[in-house]
Amino acid sequence: MNGDIAVFAGNSNKQIAEEICTHLGIQSGKINLKKFSDGEISVKIEDNVRGKEVFIVQSTSAPANDHLMELILIMDALRRASVSSISVVIPYYGYGRQDRKVEPRVPISARVVADLIEVVGLDRILTMDLHADQIQGFFRVPVDNLHFAPVLAEYVNTKKIDDLVIVSPDSGGAERARAFGKKVNGSLAIIDKRRPKANVSEVMNVIGEIEGKNCILLDDMIDTAGTICKAADALLKHGAKSVYCAATHGVLSGEAVDRINSTQFSEVVLANTIAIPESKKINKLKSLSVAPLFANAIQRIHTNQSVSTLFD
């Protein structure tokens, strides 16, 4: 990798940024990030970046508003420093779940965030497993939406799990589960959540054969973990031999870690798109690095090669 490229990291996930730089064979750019006494964010780029192709690594994870503002200010600082191009690497795109109007008088926040980022000025977005594919259309610049599935499939295949069933926790994720099942030679099951009538507990029906099988619950993220833990209990109740869980983004809000710990998961596998604090690291959680995938994409973008092969 030549000296015409620079990678800068915000505070949201410095570890993945450092791993990306290691795979690229470069040092991360020097940046001074701090807060003034009133909470305003201060940004100063310490390196000469004139004419460089710049990549900014920043997940808009919690605290989402701080990390989003930090990203925008880093972009502006670099643009004013006369870089040749800016590509933003957002491993986890916060506000992605608010991708449409679900009731009157609410914003489409995923689009608003896209507008905020784009108005500052950038050339490309590189992200992973957007909550909704249509978010790519909220930007006018190219968006490369990488997938955790190839990294996860490689890990699952090394475990050599017999009688494997890939389970979608809802009907919306069925296609994701089906596609992943082909990579690991697993069959498909879907959990159908129904509420028989008002004020009656939700019933989880399992569609597919899971009795005596090893199940992997597959989702794009784990937030409070309520859904996946209830789904795991339902699978075990229906005779599953074991239950694993795999998701790209470990948001892990509220009591998520406690819920996971008290549920009979054999293992919960996450990508490292969001930095997990030490207080939330438990034995059941397994983190897989997607830094090599992002580094490969960055290298291909830098050398004008196709990125599409990374989507397989």
Swiss-Prot record:
Gene Ontology biological-process annotations: 5-phosphoribose 1-diphosphate biosynthetic process; purine nucleotide biosynthetic process; ribonucleoside monophosphate biosynthetic process
A Pfam family per the record: Pribosyl_synth
Enzyme's top EC category: transferase
Residues that bind Mg(2+) 2: 170
Cofactor note as given: Binds 2 Mg(2+) ions per subunit.
A single Gene Ontology CC term: ribose phosphate diphosphokinase complex
Annotated PANTHER family: RIBOSE-PHOSPHATE DIPHOSPHOKINASE FAMILY MEMBER, RIBOSE-PHOSPHATE PYROPHOSPHOKINASE 1, CHLOROPLASTIC
MF-aspect GO terms: ATP binding; kinase activity; magnesium ion binding; ribose phosphate diphosphokinase activity
Cofactor(s) needed by this chain: Mg(2+)
This protein's name: Ribose-phosphate pyrophosphokinase
Enzyme Commission number(s): 2.7.6.1
Main localization (coarse): cytoplasm
Primary role: Involved in the biosynthesis of the central metabolite phospho-alpha-D-ribosyl-1-pyrophosphate (PRPP) via the transfer of pyrophosphoryl group from ATP to 1-hydroxyl of ribose-5-phosphate (Rib-5-P).
Complex and partners: Homohexamer.
